[in-house]
Amino acid sequence: MQDPNEDTEWNDILRDFGILPPKEESKDEIEEMVLRLQKEAMVKPFEKMTLAQLKEAEDEFDEEDMQAVETYRKKRLQEWKALKKKQKFGELREISGNQYVNEVTNAEEDVWVIIHLYRSSIPMCLLVNQHLSLLARKFPETKFVKAIVNSCIQHYHDNCLPTIFVYKNGQIEAKFIGIIECGGINLKLEELEWKLAEVGAIQTDLEENPRKDMVDMMVSSIRNTSIHDDSDSSNSDNDTK
């Protein structure tokens, strides 16, 4: 008679069809499973804790645990500092003229600063503020601020608004003055993102200029118009003859 516990391919097939009972686990397999469960149970609880939880529970650890906890705490602290450094800003903040030097010119070293000088009565300025607010959340490592133009520069002409200055280490790295330079009255979020990425102020994930299709259409339209005009001119010359 065939041993139902014999480890053969045929027995495995019979078990799959329910003809033979499930194979009994050997002593070695049981011991291996027990050891695995014991190993999983030995995972230190502090490896799943936050910094605050580590602080609360530190009295419960023995000396050996405390050495591991301290190493783990330092690792978590470094991760936290790196995250805080990366997510330093994250919003479009309003500043006044007397804050300009501290917030913009003397901003933290190697931090990109984008400031929008605006007037709330100009629709294009409101559109730019709306886009910058979204970009500030998307790129928290870059500092985004806005200021009413009169608080910074007296008698600034409306035709120069909106005005966007891009600073780094106290220097103006780029500027966009007026509606045309800022992208036009139909400016889209992705177009402004591309402009700021081109000067290095943000690291975009856009792969190409969002206005490329529009530019291609304009060039094609101009080319077609030129061909049409040349054709009309040629036909006119033939008619004259």
Curated annotation (Swiss-Prot):
Do you know which Gene3D superfamilies this protein is assigned to?
A: Glutaredoxin
Where, by tissue, is this protein expressed?
A: Testis-specific.
This entry carries the following GO cellular component terms, namely: cytoplasm; endoplasmic reticulum
Give UniProt keywords alphabetically. Answer: Differentiation, Endoplasmic reticulum, Spermatogenesis
* GO terms classed as biological process: acrosome assembly; protein folding; sperm axoneme assembly; spermatid development
Highest taxon, organism lineage: Eukaryota
The protein's location, in the record's own words, is:
Endoplasmic reticulum
Known InterPro entries for this protein? Phosducin-like_chap/apop_reg, Phosducin_thioredoxin-like_dom, Thioredoxin-like_sf
The reply on keyword Endoplasmic reticulum is yes
Main location group: endoplasmic reticulum
Q: Which Pfam families match?
A: Phosducin
Show the segment(s) annotated as Thioredoxin fold: 89-241
Q: Which gene encodes it?
A: PDCL2
How is this protein named in the record?
A: Phosducin-like protein 2
Q: How does it assemble?
A: Interacts with the CCT chaperonin complex and actin.
Summarizing the function annotation, the protein's role is: Essential for male fertility, spermiogenesis and acrosome formation.
Family of the protein in this entry: Belongs to the phosducin family.
Ranges of residues in domain Phosducin: 34-202
